[in-house]
Amino acid sequence: MATRIRLQRHGRKSYAFYSIVIADSRAPRDGKFTEKIGTYNPNTNPATVDLNFERALHWVLVGAQPSDTVRNILSREGVYMKKHLLGGVAKGAFGEAEAEAKFEAWKNNKQSGLSALKAKEEEAKKAEAKARLEAEKKVNEVKAKALAEKKAAEEAAKAAAEAPAEEAAPAEETATEAAAE
């Protein structure tokens, strides 16, 4: 039986997530499978992978062929690194303890790189939000200034309209007083 490690699609239209399965290469994509070893969700940033590492390593060691995407996932998760180190142990190049130490060092290095990337993304997001807030404050200041100028112009026009009316009113009073005398 030609065994493949591949993705099995789930989810709704335009929002797929996948199960990582072991299946016969002749079985259809979403058909019968031997074992489910994990899930892969490409919709998150970065993509979320939940993988049973031991079972994935077992199937790679017994010769299951992964699809291209699954090969990238397994490589990123360290399955191929572990296989490489176990091959070195089998050849006698180094001991199993040294292989474990190398694998842990590789894993820690990978995790630190991912955490640095995540921190950088968070920092960029905060900087963008701060810049957006500053731009909004400037726009609001301009709007407030324009509104204040408009109100001042309305007040000036209102005062100018009232001033001639007040001057005309005393003139009429004096005219009526003079006529009364």
Curated annotation (Swiss-Prot):
Residues 150-181 are annotated as: Disordered. Coiled coil: none annotated. One of its GO terms (molecular function) is structural constituent of ribosome. Keywords: Ribonucleoprotein, Ribosomal protein. Transmembrane segments: none annotated. One of its GO terms (biological process) is translation. It comes from the Bacteria. It holds the Pfam family Ribosomal_S16. One of its GO terms (cellular component) is small ribosomal subunit. Residues 158-181 have a biased composition (Low complexity). Belongs to the bacterial ribosomal protein bS16 family. This is Small ribosomal subunit protein bS16. It comes from Bacteroides fragilis (strain YCH46). The lineage of its organism: Bacteria, Pseudomonadati, Bacteroidota, Bacteroidia, Bacteroidales. The gene is rpsP.
